[in-house]
C-alpha cells in the first residue's frame, strides 16, 4: 500500500519559466492523488478518443493514408534511379562447375589493381 504521509514531488514551471518543486496532495475523500496545480481543472474536457469521435478518426486515417501514398511515390522514384545497376538478363548458370563436368574457371578480381600487387 502507498505511503501517503510522504508527498510525491515533481518539477513545475511558472509563467516566467522558473522551475520549482511541487508536491502531490492526497485527498482522503478522493480515489486519486491530485497535483496542487490541477485545482479548477474539474471541468476540463480531454480530446475525444478516436473510437468515440468518428470525424476525428476519419481525419487521422485520411492524413495517414495521404502520408503513406507520398512515401510510396518517393520510394518508387528512388528505386527507378537504380534500375540501371540491375542486369537485364539473369545469369542462370550453375555456380558449381565441378558438378557439370566443366573445368573451373578462374574468377576475375573485383579490384584488379589490388590483386596485381602480391605480397612478397
Curated annotation (Swiss-Prot):
UniProt key word Disulfide bond: no
Family: Belongs to the asfivirus structural protein p14.5 family.
GO biological process, alphabetically ordered: symbiont-mediated suppression of host cytoplasmic pattern recognition receptor signaling pathway via inhibition of IRF3 activity
GO molecular function terms noted in the UniProt entry: DNA binding
Start-end of Basic residues biased regions: 103-120
Region (Disordered): 1-27, 80-120
N-acetylalanine: modified positions: 2
Primary location recorded for the protein, binned into one broad class: virion
Keywords in alphabetical order: Acetylation, DNA-binding, Host-virus interaction, Inhibition of host innate immune response by virus, Inhibition of host IRF3 by virus, Inhibition of host RLR pathway by virus, Late protein, Viral immunoevasion, Viral release from host cell, Virion
Cellular location(s): Virion
Induction field: Expressed in the late phase of the viral replicative cycle.
Post-translational modification: Acetylated.
UniProt source species: African swine fever virus (strain Badajoz 1971 Vero-adapted)
Summary of subunit composition and partner proteins: Interacts with the major capsid protein. Interacts with host IRF3; this interaction interferes with the recruitment of IRF3 to TBK1.
UniProt function note: Structural protein required for transport of intracellular particles from the assembly sites to the plasma membrane. Binds to both ssDNA and dsDNA. Suppressed the activation of the cGAS/STING pathway by interfering with the recruitment of IRF3 to TBK1, which in turn suppresses IRF3 phosphorylation, decreasing interferon production.
Name of the protein in its database record: Protein p14.5
GO cellular component labels: virion component
Amino acid at each position: 500500500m502507498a505511503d501517503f504521509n510522504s508527498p510525491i514531488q515533481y518539477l513545475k514551471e511558472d509563467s516566467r519559466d522558473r522551475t520549482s518543486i511541487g508536491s502531490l496532495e492526497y485527498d482522503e475523500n478522493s480515489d486519486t492523488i491530485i497535483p496542487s496545480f490541477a485545482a479548477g481543472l474539474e471541468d476540463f474536457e480531454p480530446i475525444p478518443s478516436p473510437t468515440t469521435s468518428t470525424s476525428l478518426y476519419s481525419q487521422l486515417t485520411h492524413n495517414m493514408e495521404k502520408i503513406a501514398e507520398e512515401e510510396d511515390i518517393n520510394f518508387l522514384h528512388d528505386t527507378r534511379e537504380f534500375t540501371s545497376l540491375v542486369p537485364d538478363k539473369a545469369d542462370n548458370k550453375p555456380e558449381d562447375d565441378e558438378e557439370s563436368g566443366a573445368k573451373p574457371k578462374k574468377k576475375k578480381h573485383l579490384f584488379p589493381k589490388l590483386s596485381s600487387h602480391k605480397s612478397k
